[in-house]
Amino acid sequence: MTLSRAPRRKTVAGASAQQVGLNFETPDDIVCGVDEAGRGPLAGPVVAAAVIFDPSKPMIRGLDDSKVLTAKKRDELYDKIVDRALAYCIASATVEEIDSLNILHATMLAMKRAVEGLSVVPTLVKIDGNRCPTLSVRSEAVIGGDALVKSISAASILAKVTRDRMLLELHQTHPVYGFNAHAGYGTPQHLKALREHGPCEHHRRSFAPVREAHLRLSTGMPLPAGEVIVVSEVMFDDDAFGERGSAV
């Protein structure tokens, strides 16, 4: 899934030559902000967004880390961002890619797709977190960037709203899991549904609670009602990012 905007592709002469430069921001830079949503959930894709703002235009008010905004505010800002951004792209990595690559590398893949899908070529990509995907342009990891860099804040909002809407669609075909309530995260409601119904094709079988629920039901030994599946903190904290994501 990739959504993008802008009528034609633009680039800046010499951008590739600046790739290895030490000056990470010059007045001529076209800065792109990148963030993701959905590293921690037990189900659904991981979604990334890339946003470029026109520096000559007034900045959208109210941009912030999507996690501190209400759903209503995120929806309002989503419409403003897609209307006023110089360019944006929303991309994802599938559940199958998450299970085959691990969540870290699938997230990097979604981010790479978002940047490469932009209709305007950036000269500097600022990414929330402490890792950057392999890109053909300069990139910089910004810890806490979704609250510090406006284009990253915008990307976090696009990614979050898009993914939440995708999980609402999944709820229509798989209502027993309550995706409309938790967006795939490992809440008690979701874990209970996994115990009772087992995982569906949209669950991440590389994640321990899903894998264990599938194993219990496939062997005819469902979890007792009082038994608790231990869920790694990476599933609940979208800022907890590291290789351990593959072993959840």
UniProtKB/Swiss-Prot annotation:
Enzyme class, first EC level, given as a word: hydrolase
Domain called RNase H type-2: residue spans: 29-219
Protein source organism: Paraburkholderia phytofirmans (strain DSM 17436 / LMG 22146 / PsJN) (Burkholderia phytofirmans)
InterPro entries assigned to the protein according to its UniProt record, in alphabetical order: RNase_HII, RNase_HII/HIII, RNase_HII/HIII_dom, RNaseH-like_sf, RNaseH_sf
The keyword Membrane is assigned to this record: no
Keyword Cytoplasm attributed: yes
Pfam families for this protein: RNase_HII (PF01351)
Reactions catalysed, as given in the entry: Endonucleolytic cleavage to 5'-phosphomonoester
Keywords per UniProt: Cytoplasm, Endonuclease, Hydrolase, Manganese, Metal-binding, Nuclease
Protein name (record): Ribonuclease HII
MF annotations from Gene Ontology: manganese ion binding; RNA binding; RNA-DNA hybrid ribonuclease activity
Cystine bridges: none
EC number, as in UniProt: 3.1.26.4
Function: Endonuclease that specifically degrades the RNA of RNA-DNA hybrids.
Cofactor field: Mn(2+); Mg(2+)
Localization terms from the record: Cytoplasm
Principal localisation: cytoplasm
